[in-house]
Amino acid sequence: MTDFLNKLLSWYQSNARDFPFRQTTDPYLIWLSEVIMQQTRIEQGVPYYNSFVKVFPTVHDLAGASEEEVLKQWQGLGYYTRARNLHATANEIVEKYGGRFPENYENLRELKGVGDYTAAAIASVCFGQPHPVMDGNVIRFITRHFGITDAVDLAAAKKEIMEVLDELMENVQVLWEVSSATELLRPTIGLLPKSGKPLTSSLPRLTLTEASPSGDPAAVPDATEPSHNPFHPGLFNQAMIEFGATYCVPRNPNCRECIFNESCYALKYGMVDKLPLKKQQQALKSRYFHYLVISVRGKKGIYFRKRTENDIWKGLYEFPLIETSKPVTLPRLLNSIEWKQHFGKTPLKILSQTGSASHLLSHQKISATFYRLEIEKPSDKFGSLIHPKNIHELPVARIIEKYLETHQTSEL
């Protein structure tokens, strides 16, 4: 295990990508980065992270925001339950802990929306606690290298993966404590970054002297470990994720030049393209949305309604909607009970129909058709009539955002 760790952490120091959240151990910033990066590829998530930190630089700012403001900043990331949990957790941290994050894994795990992965990331990076993280990148790396051939979405395989990670983390903890106590483990030529790349640009700062973004020095966790010590639990976790994300990739990894090619089970037995093994994926559920883009003759704006039911996109705004169990033509839609419930004898004019647009979620496929309609008089039953200049302030799902991008709000 020591040889594995030496190779991994040496590789990380020389190859880690430089991201803003790798330059801090502030638990608020680490928490934000972990939640956001779970939604998207890290390169795509960095702009969201930067924007979020700019608008909500401290946990107090996030807690004091409205849910709509949070959802608007989250727009485009999907899975909006996480954004709502983020907001709720910020309020919990402010109200219950005075704005300071709990400093142990168990209390972090009790926070709303904070699972094993996020709690382990905060505990290890910010507080040096030996809790391994397990995401898709880590699972892929571990199953290939150590030869775990059970389906990874089953409990038995997850337990086996965590046992390997726990053993690795135990070794990290021992090496960290020894090196911190004796100061014998210093960077060697093999541990130094590539030429021209400063060490601090690729590793989290483990010794902080500045105040946190909130301006409160007390909010910065104590970190007395020397920044050059590679055997830090947080660095181990980040190295595992980084290697899986950039080297032990899902398809066509460069095994010939991999630093673990002599010890990798999957490479030895020709299973690189087969691991990690997964059981049959759940079939996608198809849903058919018919959006009614309603305006009022002689008035600027279109109607929006807020989704309040316990379904996808809760808390976001959308056009009035009719959902059907299968694709339907416009004549059939006009004769449906749902259409009559919406409009009854309300005079209206159908201006246009936009062809079906698709949007994939984790277990659902949304097929949406948009109908531009004009009614004679305003009606509260369709929601709120939003002026074009204010539409951009509403948090909306990506499928609505795409429609608005295609059809300029000034024309609506």
Locations of regions flagged by a protein language model:
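Ser/Thr/Pro-rich, intrinsically disordered low-complexity segments
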Residues: L206-L208
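Intrinsically disordered, low-complexity, charged terminal extensions of DNA damage-control enzymes
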Residues: M1-R17, Q23, V174-S180, T188-P204, ...
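Catalytic cores of DNA base-excision repair glycosylases
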Residues: F4-K7, W11-S202, A211-P253, S263, ...
